[in-house]
Amino acid sequence: MEMQDLTSPHSRLSGSSESPSGPKLGNSHINSNSMTPNGTEVKTEPMSSSETASTTADGSLNNFSGSAIGSSSFSPRPTHQFSPPQIYPSNRPYPHILPTPSSQTMAAYGQTQFTTGMQQATAYATYPQPGQPYGISSYGALWAGIKTEGGLSQSQSPGQTGFLSYGTSFSTPQPGQAPYSYQMQGSSFTTSSGIYTGNNSLTNSSGFNSSQQDYPSYPSFGQGQYAQYYNSSPYPAHYMTSSNTSPTTPSTNATYQLQEPPSGITSQAVTDPTAEYSTIHSPSTPIKDSDSDRLRRGSDGKSRGRGRRNNNPSPPPDSDLERVFIWDLDETIIVFHSLLTGSYANRYGRDPPTSVSLGLRMEEMIFNLADTHLFFNDLEECDQVHIDDVSSDDNGQDLSTYNFGTDGFPAAATSANLCLATGVRGGVDWMRKLAFRYRRVKEIYNTYKNNVGGLLGPAKREAWLQLRAEIEALTDSWLTLALKALSLIHSRTNCVNILVTTTQLIPALAKVLLYGLGIVFPIENIYSATKIGKESCFERIIQRFGRKVVYVVIGDGVEEEQGAKKHAMPFWRISSHSDLMALHHALELEYL
């Protein structure tokens, strides 16, 4: 009887079909002669490794002549897949061989069902392999270099799906392509002929281990030979590391290095045959914090967000807050001081007298609103950094019928030097009256921040609208550009606008109302740096929102730039219209 001796020392095919109970299976031997259903014996001729690579469909799938299996010294553990029980009945137990699943319906040698099954090309072409092919752990040295017929080593290309992949052009079984399925991650090959079933699968734990296999001994199936059958790019580029994107660079590790998939994806079965990794949506920018981080942030805001008298200036920040934009007011959001001095007109070629006139008209309107409705006459010498700095002295009394003109607060303020920059506190009664006024200012601001015309009255409303239009025309819509960026930030649920200005708090509130900024600046987010400076205001803001959020400072002056540098905050300088447009563009692209 002729023997077939293949290149691998671990896999020899020998034996005879004379045994009535079928072939004897040893640890590294198996019969090379097969029996057909009519009882005839088919013998295989000795082949070299290069000849076996070109064997066509009339070669048996059971004779192991395919070089991808014959020369790979496959362990006898998976050989039960090539011994259909209807051909070689045997009652002899083989403990080293896994039992054949009952659902396996393999056809006998020589029948045409294999060709029919292999022609079901669509069953294989639509299955992307999410990890190592066939559920087998890394082939070790096989991935680093695969021997071809010529003996040269080739690297596995990232565009090639696996050594035994099936392409759409395989109409006949190729040598070494065994009629059983390989376990995929969440799926298996299944055709109408029932040859490939999900239960009939091989995993790494059942038959493949490094001690039994000589992985680099695959001499055939060069990757260039069947390159046309492989999908050119089965994996999206963002799921591959940069070190493996070149098909010509050998790798010392496994060729396919996929990034860690999101949790919950690895255990899901592939139910859609056309499913790809591209269906996984990465988290949106910016990334949300975990629940524990948000709880800690909330507790930080409650415990540390208090003023110098241990009062809470504002509600605790939103648990999802991730970015805080700290704005300057004059010459950043609005053009006001440079109108009064005429510097804006000189810079942009406008008429200086017209510019100064518009500035004076706006200044008069600002202080008129502050004096008439915001108690500026009473509070000018009792300026605060934040609207809630004196809220701890408020007893919550109903102010609907309270008469601010007759409570004696102005006389007490002028006769006693109680409103000092150092925050010296007066009597309890006087401090309560001060707190009443700031509470009333807060109520007016929240009521009219979207309807300043209702606060001014019909006559002043028309003058205000006319003045706003003239200033916008002179300044080339500076405020409109700033409002676009402010509104975009305000529309985000994880961002907030903060205003820090060197103007006193009450005139600053009047400016915000008259320039239509109340909708993007809640009164709790407005700080006056008149007494303590912007750097100290930045420290208060950090204490309020915590250090886990990202702070961005936007302004035109040196003071805010130095404060931002000290606290390691990014600084966006505003010196022209183009800076405002660039800021809005960066916000639209979510760079900020």
From Swiss-Prot:
Enzyme Commission code: 3.1.3.16, 3.1.3.48
GO biological processes: anatomical structure morphogenesis; aorta morphogenesis; branching involved in ureteric bud morphogenesis; cell differentiation; cochlea morphogenesis; double-strand break repair; embryonic skeletal system morphogenesis; epithelial cell proliferation
Tissue: In the embryo, highly expressed in kidney with lower levels in brain. Weakly expressed in lung. In the adult, highly expressed in heart and skeletal muscle. Weakly expressed in brain and liver. No expression in eye or kidney.
Subcellular location: Cytoplasm; Nucleus
Reaction catalyzed: O-phospho-L-tyrosyl-[protein] + H2O = L-tyrosyl-[protein] + phosphate; O-phospho-L-seryl-[protein] + H2O = L-seryl-[protein] + phosphate; O-phospho-L-threonyl-[protein] + H2O = L-threonyl-[protein] + phosphate
Superkingdom of origin organism: Eukaryota
Disulfide bonds: none
Biased composition (Low complexity): 8-26, 64-75, 241-253
Composition bias, Polar residues: 28-63, 254-287
Protein transport recorded as keyword: no
Cofactor(s) the protein requires to work: Mg(2+)
Co-factor binding details: Binds 1 Mg(2+) ion per subunit.
Protein family per UniProt: Belongs to the HAD-like hydrolase superfamily. EYA family.
Subunit and partners: Probably interacts with SIX2, SIX4 and SIX5. Interacts with H2AX in response to DNA damage. Interacts with SIX3; promotes EYA1 translocation to the nucleus.
Reported function: Functions both as protein phosphatase and as transcriptional coactivator for SIX1, and probably also for SIX2, SIX4 and SIX5. Tyrosine phosphatase that dephosphorylates 'Tyr-142' of histone H2AX (H2AXY142ph) and promotes efficient DNA repair via the recruitment of DNA repair complexes containing MDC1. 'Tyr-142' phosphorylation of histone H2AX plays a central role in DNA repair and acts as a mark that distinguishes between apoptotic and repair responses to genotoxic stress. Its function as histone phosphatase may contribute to its function in transcription regulation during organogenesis.
Name of the protein in question: Protein phosphatase EYA1
Organism in which the protein naturally occurs: Homo sapiens (Human)
Gene: EYA1
